[in-house]
C-alpha cells in the first residue's frame, strides 16, 4: 500500500527515509558512522506578553550551514561509548557549562539508520535540566570552542501558536532542518507530551500552508 502524504515531509519525501533501529543492533553494524545529538529542555513558568505560556524551554542551534539542528556530532565507537562521545561534542559546541551535565544511557531515546548520502546511524537523547542550568548554558555558549564556527548560536523552540494560527511553532517548522532533526523534534513533542497528536497535526498543516 502506498503511503499517504504528510505535511512534514516537504519536498524530500521521495528520497530514502531513515529506518528505526535498536541501540544494540546499531552498534553491531559495520561500516557505519555514528552521530549522537541531544535535546536539552527545562520547564518554564514564563509568559510571552504576560499571557502566552512558554511552558518549556527546548534548545536547538543554528549550524554553520544555515540549518537548524540539535547539539552533538559524530562519535567513534571504537574508542569511546556513545554517551562519552556525545558529552565531548556537547562541551565543544555548548561550552563549559556542560562540564557538570551528565548525559547517560537513561537519556537515550531512539536510533535511526540511513544508507544515503552516507552510511550513518543517528542516536537521539533527551535530557531534562533545571531552567537555571539551561540559562547558564545559553550564557556561556559564547565561550564554547565551536561558537561562531560550527555553531552560530542557540535557539529556543516556540511551543505555542499565536492568534494568527501560524506564528510560533508552525512558522518555526518552516525552517531548514539538518538530516532527521525535524522528525526528532516532533518525536520529542510526542514523547514529552508537550502537545496532543491533534495539536501536532494542526501545527504541521499550518506550517505546510506557509511553505506552499
UniProtKB/Swiss-Prot annotation:
Effect of residue 150 to Q: Loss of activity; no effect on RNA-binding
Residues that bind Mn(2+) 2: 89
Reactions catalysed, as given in the entry: a 5'-end (N(7)-methyl 5'-triphosphoguanosine)-ribonucleoside in mRNA + H2O = N(7)-methyl-GDP + a 5'-end phospho-ribonucleoside in mRNA + 2 H(+); IDP + H2O = IMP + phosphate + H(+); dIDP + H2O = dIMP + phosphate + H(+); a 5'-end NAD(+)-phospho-ribonucleoside in mRNA + H2O = a 5'-end phospho-ribonucleoside in mRNA + NAD(+) + H(+)
Note accompanying the cofactor annotation: Binds 3 or 4 divalent metal cations. Acts specifically on U8 snoRNA with magnesium as cofactor. Has broad substrate specificity with bound manganese or cobalt (in vitro).
Cofactor field: Mg(2+); Mn(2+); Co(2+)
Stated role: RNA-binding and decapping enzyme that catalyzes the cleavage of the cap structure of snoRNAs and mRNAs in a metal-dependent manner. Part of the U8 snoRNP complex that is required for the accumulation of mature 5.8S and 28S rRNA. Has diphosphatase activity and removes m7G and/or m227G caps from U8 snoRNA and leaves a 5'monophosphate on the RNA. Also catalyzes the cleavage of the cap structure on mRNAs. Does not hydrolyze cap analog structures like 7-methylguanosine nucleoside triphosphate (m7GpppG). Also hydrolysis m7G- and m227G U3-capped RNAs but with less efficiencies.
Protein name, per record: U8 snoRNA-decapping enzyme
Organism this protein belongs to: Xenopus laevis (African clawed frog)
Amino acid at each position: 500500500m502506498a503511503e499517504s502524504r504528510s505535511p512534514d515531509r516537504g519536498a524530500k519525501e521521495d528520497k530514502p527515509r531513515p529506518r528505526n533501529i535498536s541501540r544494540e543492533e546499531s552498534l553491531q553494524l559495520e561500516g557505519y558512522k555514528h552521530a549522537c545529538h541531544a535535546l536539552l529542555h527545562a520547564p518554564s513558568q514564563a509568559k510571552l506578553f504576560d499571557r502566552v505560556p512558554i511552558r518549556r524551554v527546548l534548545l536547538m542551534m543554528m549550524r554553520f550551514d544555515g540549518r537548524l539542528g540539535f547539539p552533538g556530532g559524530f562519535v567513534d565507537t571504537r574508542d569511546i561509548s556513545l554517551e562519552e562521545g556525545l558529552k565531548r561534542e556537547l562541551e565543544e559546541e555548548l561550552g563549559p557549562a556542560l562540564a557538570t551535565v551528565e548525559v547517560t544511557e537513561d537519556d537515550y531515546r531512539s536510533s535511526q539508520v540511513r544508507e544515503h548520502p552516507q552510511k550513518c546511524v543517528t542516536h537521539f537523547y533527551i535530557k531534562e535540566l533545571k531552567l537555571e542550568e539551561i540559562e547558564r548554558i545559553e550564557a556561556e555558549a559564547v565561550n564554547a570552542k565551536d561558537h561562531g564556527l560550527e555553531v552560530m548560536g542557540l535557539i529556543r523552540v516556540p511551543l505555542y501558536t499565536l492568534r494568527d494560527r501560524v506564528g510560533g511553532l508552525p512558522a518555526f517548522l518552516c525552517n531548514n532542518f539538518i538530516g532527521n532533526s525535524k522528525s526528532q523534534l516532533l518525536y520529542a513533542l510526542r514523547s514529552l507530551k508537550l502537545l496532543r497528536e491533534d495539536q501536532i497535526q494542526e501545527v504541521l498543516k499550518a506550517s505546510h500552508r506557509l511553505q506552499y
